[in-house]
Amino acid sequence: MPLNVHPDIISLSPYVPGKPIEELQRELGLARIIKLASNENPLGPSMKARAALSQGAETLHRYPDGGAFRLREALADRWKVTPDQIILGNGSDEILGLLARTFLAPGDEAIMADQTFVIYKMEVTAAHGRPVIVPLKQWRHDLQAMAGAITDRTKLLFLCNPNNPTGTMVSASEVERLLLRVPAHTVVVFDEAYFEYVRSQQFPDSMAYVKQGRNVIVLRTFSKIYGLAGLRIGYGVTTAEITNFLNRVRPPFNVNSLAQRAALAALGDDEHVARSRAVNAAGMEQMVKGLAALGFAPIPSEANFVYVDIGRDGRQVFEAMLREGVIVRHIEGRMVRVTIGMEEENREFLAALKRVVHPALSAG
């Protein structure tokens, strides 16, 4: 008997993550692998977070705090909001799913860019909503076109800032103009996973929009600069009214106790965050200069990765780099995304890329 699967689910393709280090080691028998595919912090978690994990092992037989009281209190204090304005997720990805399930009825619309975080489209489709795709303009969100795409059925508008995979950002003045055109029935989702890496002074203060009581939610994560990707924990800051509805569809105990402990400790380690920013800034300069020396011009990035036109089939370059023991992320066509690593990792990546794209020069 055939399965009776909803057509929207049939239309989806499973998410394909960056290739795991262990998998490549098994396939090629390589001892050393450099992974620059998933925008992880090369420093890893702070020592405070590691210590918190060790201490948390003693209570693993107990269910976690379902309301994440201590972590929500700390986040509320950090962003000067109330704890009932904070929602925790098993990664910020989970909160994207909660938003889709909460706000989308079948056929309702959600606006997003064409080259942005793929999970938006997946979650909207899984909730039987309709993704409305607006092309990027010069690698950046076209906020004017996104505002023009809003209809009576638009319930969500996703703004990944800085954008993944391009690394580009939209400014405060651009966002202000967008918000003037957003009706009350549309919730704007500021997905700011890479917020802590931003250097531009023009970046919008999205938390201010929350405090103004607007229908917005700001998503942040502990997976990137805090180095806790393996624990899956992220959070949203919004109005108490919106969190109230999101909590109605949030699974119980969705954030495990180790993740809560580590995130709380990481949040209090500003020194580790500062060091991570410094490593990224130095690595970004090294990467941009190294790519330029090879004839490539990556798109200016405000995140912890670069997006670059590699000048040839990106899939072939990706596969050739795997054989060199380097994992990057092929996005589409000639475009490849590369995470900023430690100095030695960046140097080895650039040397491997030179061997792949300029073999004659490398041999010489």
Predicted regions: what is each one?
Residues 67, 215-299:
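PLP-dependent aminotransferase class I/II
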Residues 125, 143-153, 165-188, 192-223:
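Active-site pre-lysine segment of PLP-dependent enzymes
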Residues 32, 82-86, 106-109, 153, ...:
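Short acidic capping loops at alpha-helix termini that bridge into adjacent secondary structure
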Residues 173, 319-364:
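PLP-dependent enzyme catalytic core of the Aspartate aminotransferase-like
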Residues 102-159:
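PLP-dependent aminotransferase-like
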Residues 280-281, 289-324, 340:
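Conserved PLP-binding catalytic core of the aspartate aminotransferase-like
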Residues 61-109, 127:
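Phosphate-binding glycine-rich loop
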Residues 1-62:
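N-terminal "arm"/small-domain region of PLP-dependent enzymes with the aminotransferase-like
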